[in-house]
Every structure is written in structure tokens, then in C-alpha cells.
Amino acid sequence: MGCLILVSGVPGSGKSTFCAKYEERGKVAVFSSDETRKQLTGSYTNFSREKEMWQTLYNNAYTILTRFPEMDVILDATYLSENQRLKVWRNFCEVADDLCLVQFQLDPNLARKQNESREKVVPGDAFDAMLAKFQPVTAEELNYYGSVVIVRNRDTREVLKYGNCSRHIDWL
């Protein structure tokens, strides 16, 4: 089976850019909460069907991991809290060969600036609320993920744990 790569970070931190670059390498399916929400509701900002959105996102990822073992899967969402990230681990730990966490910990001012210059702008007050909820990777999470990478900016990354999945993110 393939690896599951979970990207985490506030809006504008580079998650979707990372996913797009990874997708160019082939043999990967990217499932985005924003894109799934838009497919279901017609809008990135319509949160009326969140439960269905998450079920769809996870079902799609599960299908790829179980039917196409040569494929990797990336889940592109904010995953701001440890609880959110561990829920993903619990759902996929027996399905994926390895799970990798790539967390984007950019300077908040840079992330805010990048958020404001993208198509899917998160309003300032909502961005601030998300920033306040953001939890950096915890020591406990290192026990769960095979690989953990922190991206601080375009030129700086820190590998906290290097496992099987790392072969897929060495190019970062």
C-alpha cells in the first residue's frame, strides 16, 4: 500500500502549493477539504455539509490506498490540533504503509500575507481564530507518524522523525 501524507498548517502556509508540486511527481492522489467542500456545496466557504465533506474526503483516500497500492495519498486540510491529526492516524494506520506528517510552521505574518494573495482568502478574523487554534507537533505525535517534517519557510525544513515515508518527501 501507499503512504498517507497529512499536511497541517494555517491558510496561506504552503500546504496546497506543496500538494501541487508533489502531484507533479505522479502516483499520488490529493484530497483537499476545500475542493471536496466546493464539490458538495458549490463553494469553498459553505460549511453546511461538513460531516459529509469529511466522510467523502476520507472515503476517497481509503479507496485509493486499498485499491491502488502503488499510489500515495495526501490529505490537504488545516489539521490545526493534535486531536484532528490523531483522528486521521487512527483511521488510516492499518490501511497505509506509513503515515507522514508535514506541518507548515511559517511566520504568522508571512502566512497572513500569502493567505491574502490567494484565490481562497480566509477573512482576517477567521484567520486569527485559526492561528490561535494551531498546535505545533507534539512529542506524542512523534510516536504515531513514521515521518514528521516541519517546514518553516521555502528554504528551511526540519526532519523530526525519518521513516519509510521519508523517501517520498526528500525533495522538499
Question: Where are the language model's segments positioned?
Answer:
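Pre-Walker A (Motif I) flank of P-loop NTPase domains
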Residues: 1-5, 69-71
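Conserved nucleotide-binding/hydrolysis micro-motifs of P-loop NTPases
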Residues: 35-37, 79-80, 105-110, 155-156
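Conserved beta-strand scaffold positions in the cores of enzyme catalytic domains, especially
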Residues: 28-30, 99-101, 147-150
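Conserved substrate/cofactor phosphate-moiety recognition/catalytic segment
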Residues: 16-71, 112
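Conserved phosphate-donor/acceptor-positioning beta-strand/loop module used by diverse small-molecule
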Residues: 95-114
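Conserved GTP-binding G-domain of TRAFAC-class P-loop NTPases and closely related GTPase folds
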Residues: 2, 8, 13, 21, ...
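Conserved beta-strand segments of the P-loop GTPase G domain that flank and frequently precede/overlap
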Residues: 74-76, 102-105, 150-151
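Glycine-rich phosphate-binding loop used to anchor ATP phosphates in small-molecule kinases
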Residues: 49-100
